[in-house]
Structure formats: structure tokens, C-alpha cells
């Protein structure tokens, strides 16, 4: 299967190439924007909605009144009366059985959406460009494995078909009947309440036939399941991208295919059938960035890569690491050496001062000993002790103190103490 080519072959009703070629319209090279297609499809689909609303009286067709406070029940309005289960039940609220809904729907909701004309055209261009890529068409689920070429163009004679058997024969010759078989196999019953609303059966989408003039082609193809027919002048994004997804399998007639350049123009020429419309362009012609960056034109303008390796440096504390401190402050070495010298000098001064004080104390003790007339005797450990001075005994502690004999108590004398009169001599 051929991808998008500058020339597209035109196939006859026998499924063979007729020998004619058609230039590929520029719209098939337009940028594919699935986001724009989805946005436009979502908003245009809302224009088919029918307004609906609930009755304004729904949920309020009963007499109910709140009981107020003091009864240990909720203050929701309650049905009045007695003699039935309904009396005393809650009413009106959206949380009550038989009550109204929250925010009852109204018919004056904003049902429709306006979409910019240029944006709608952009979406159609993207959908047409995607229909020419086999990968996107196959990802959409179409069976096009045996189709000879994409986009598929047939002669204008097909527009004059009036019989369905002619249309079926054409699809079989073009190897497109496999897509119709897929539609037949997908026919099933709808799930949900749509069965009760005249939407019982559902099926997949088949090919989209795009023509220029209706000379009976609609009657020939309309009864084949899955087929969609579109006029090239009235392309619809809802049909070209069902569900908002690009990649619809399209079969073109020759005249409709040639008319695309007049409808959407090219990048050199504006559209002749639309006023002031230019075909959207790509931001990049070539999206292969690796090929662009490796091209000689780009490489010639680039500088040589720098091979400098930036290694992570372990941060060290300069207050604890002298080498790092010297990098930050070379004068730190001098400051530290001056500190060491100052400390040594101060230490020497303290030692000298202590020695001088000891010498002065020794001289003073010598003077006292000379005054007493006793020569000082050098004792143990270099201590000077005066001669004739008894050494004080240490107090006894413990068992030794208990073992020593206690001195005998003095006996009381029997002699009477003289009175004051006897002591005093007579005058």
C-alpha cells in the first residue's frame, strides 16, 4: 500500500488503475491537530441537543410543613395529616423520597456552542490529512489491508450509479468490501435505555464516499450499512472524524479530489472558493530533530563541545582544616604562629614569676630562723626544720585511738574550800 505521494492514481470501476494521475492536494499535507479536531467535534455535536427540563411543580405537589425544633427530629418539611404512612414523612428536599431534584433543569440552558469558522476549517484540514495516512486509518479500525492506494480516488462515472448492486461490485473490486464486512459483524443491540427510544441497533462506521455532484450516487450507496456520503463542498467534521478521532477511510471521486485545492488553497495560493482563507502551515517542515541537529549546516555553526569535567567538591570546614583555611586566608598561618609564640612567652613569664616568689619566701624563712638563733636543718624532701622544735603528732583515728588508755579522772579533795572570810586576812 502506498503512502501519500505527489501523484495519486485514479482507479476505474473495475478496480484497476485507469492510467490517469491526480496531483495530491495541499490540504493532505496540512498539520494534523487531534486536539483541535476533538475540541471542534465536541462543541459542534452539542448543537444537535434537544432542550429538556423537569416540571416546575415536581416534588412540590403536597402540603408539608416543618415541625420546628424541640422534637429531636430533622427540621425538613414533613407531610401533614395522619392515618397513612405518608404523613410525617419528609418532603420537598432533594434528599427526601418524592422530593424535587437539586437545581431543577430549565429549558433556557445554554445548549448550543459557537465555534470560530477558521477553527472549524482547521479541524477539517487535519481530518483530511489524517485520512491519507494508512497508519492512522488502520488505528481507527478500518480494514484497508488490501486497498491498493490511500487516498483512494475513483473515476467520475461512479457518481452516475443508481443501483446498489453496482456500488457493491465497485467496493468489492476496490478491495474495500472488507470494511463493510466489519460493519456487518459489529451490528448489535444497544445497551441501556436507548433501546426504548428508537435507537435499538448500533454498528461500526464504514467508508466515507465523497462526491462532487449527485447523479444518483446517494441512492446507490445509502442502503449499504456503515457508508457515509458527503458532498465535497459541504464537508462535515462530525462525519470525517466520528467521535472526535481522526483517521476515517475516505473514497473520493476524481472531480471532488481535484476541487480540494480550490476549496482550501495551497501554501502558495489562497483558496478561490473561500474568502481570505489560507491553508494552515506546519511550525516545522521536518520534525526529525536528530537529523536537523546532525546536518552539516547546523554542525558548522556550532562550537566544539567542551570536555571539561566538573567534579563535585567535598566542602570542608576551614576552622578544622588548616589547609583549607590557608587557601581562604594565607595570613592565618602567621596569625597562628604568633599565637603560639605569645602563649610560650606568657608561659615563661608565669614560670619565672612563680620561681621568684618561691625564692623570696625562702629568704624570708631563713631570716626568721637566723633571728631565733637556730640553724635550720634540712629534713626530708628538702624541707628546712628548726632544731629543738618538736614535731606535732597527728591525731589518732579509729582503732588506735580506742586502744590508747584514757587518763584517770582526778579525785575530789575532801578538804573544804575556804570561805571568802577565811581567805581574806584580817585587817
Curated annotation (Swiss-Prot):
Q: GO molecular function of the protein, one example?
A: structural constituent of ribosome
UniProt PTM: Citrullinated by PADI4.
Q: Which biological process, per GO, is one annotated for this protein?
A: translation
Omega-N-methylarginine is found on: 97
Q: Which residues carry this modification: Phosphothreonine?
A: 266
Q: Does the keyword Transport apply?
A: no
> Where is the Glycyl lysine isopeptide (Lys-Gly) (interchain with G-Cter in SUMO1) crosslink found in the sequence?
364
Residues bearing N6-acetyllysine are 14, 106, 259, 333, 353, 364
What family name appears in the similarity comment? Belongs to the universal ribosomal protein uL4 family.
Protein name, per record: Large ribosomal subunit protein uL4
Q: Which gene is transcribed and translated to give this protein?
A: RPL4
Amino acid at each position: 500500500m502506498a503512502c501519500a505521494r505527489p501523484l495519486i492514481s485514479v482507479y476505474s470501476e473495475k478496480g484497476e488503475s485507469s492510467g490517469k494521475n491526480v496531483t495530491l492536494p495541499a490540504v493532505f499535507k496540512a498539520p494534523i491537530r487531534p486536539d483541535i479536531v476533538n475540541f471542534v467535534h465536541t462543541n459542534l455535536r452539542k448543537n444537535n441537543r434537544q432542550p429538556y427540563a423537569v416540571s416546575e411543580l415536581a416534588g412540590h405537589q403536597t402540603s408539608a410543613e416543618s415541625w420546628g425544633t424541640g422534637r429531636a427530629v430533622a427540621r425538613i418539611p414533613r407531610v401533614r395529616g395522619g392515618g397513612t404512612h405518608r404523613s410525617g414523612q419528609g418532603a420537598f428536599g432533594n434528599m427526601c423520597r418524592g422530593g424535587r431534584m437539586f437545581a431543577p433543569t430549565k429549558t433556557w440552558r445554554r445548549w448550543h456552542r459557537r465555534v470560530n469558522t477558521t477553527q472549524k476549517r482547521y479541524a477539517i484540514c487535519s481530518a483530511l490529512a489524517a485520512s491519507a495516512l494508512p497508519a492512522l486509518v488502520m488505528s481507527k479500525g478500518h480494514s484497508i489491508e488490501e486497498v491498493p492506494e490511500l487516498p483512494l480516488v475513483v473515476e467520475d462515472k461512479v457518481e452516475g450509479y443508481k443501483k446498489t448492486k453496482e456500488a457493491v461490485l465497485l467496493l468489492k473490486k476496490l478491495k474495500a468490501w472488507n470494511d463493510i464486512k466489519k460493519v456487518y459483524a459489529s451490528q448489535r443491540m444497544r445497551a441501556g435505555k436507548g433501546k426504548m427510544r428508537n435507537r435499538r441497533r448500533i454498528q461500526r462506521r464504514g467508508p466515507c464516499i465523497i462526491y462532487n455532484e449527485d447523479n444518483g450516487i446517494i441512492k446507490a450507496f445509502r442502503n449499504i450499512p456503515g457508508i457515509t456520503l458527503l458532498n465535497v463542498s459541504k464537508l462535515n467534521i462530525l462525519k470525517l472524524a466520528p467521535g472526535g478521532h481522526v483517521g476515517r477511510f475516505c473514497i473520493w471521486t476524481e472531480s471532488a479530489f481535484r476541487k480540494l485545492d480550490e476549496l482550501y488553497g495551497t501554501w502558495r495560493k489562497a483558496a478561490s472558493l473561500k474568502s481570505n482563507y489560507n491553508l494552515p502551515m506546519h511550525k516545522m517542515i521536518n520534525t526529525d530533530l536528530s537529523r536537523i541537529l546532525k546536518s552539516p549546516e547546523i554542525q558548522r555553526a556550532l562550537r566544539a563541545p567542551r570536555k571539561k569535567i566538573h567534579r563535585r567538591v567535598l566542602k570542608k570546614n576551614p576552622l578544622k582544616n588548616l589547609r583549607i583555611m590557608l587557601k581562604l586566608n594565607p595570613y592565618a598561618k602567621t596569625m597562628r604562629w604568633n599565637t603560639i609564640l605569645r602563649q610560650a612567652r606568657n608561659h615563661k613569664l608565669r614560670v619565672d614569676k612563680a620561681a621568684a616568689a618561691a625564692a623570696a619566701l625562702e629568704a624570708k624563712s631563713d631570716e626568721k630562723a637566723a633571728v631565733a638563733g637556730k640553724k635550720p636543718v634540712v629534713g626530708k624532701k628538702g624541707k628546712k626544720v628548726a632544731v629543738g622544735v618538736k614535731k606535732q603528732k597527728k591525731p589518732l583515728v579509729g582503732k588506735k585511738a580506742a586502744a590508747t588508755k584514757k587518763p584517770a579522772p582526778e579525785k575530789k579533795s575532801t578538804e573544804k574550800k575556804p570561805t571568802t572570810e577565811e581567805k581574806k586576812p584580817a585587817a
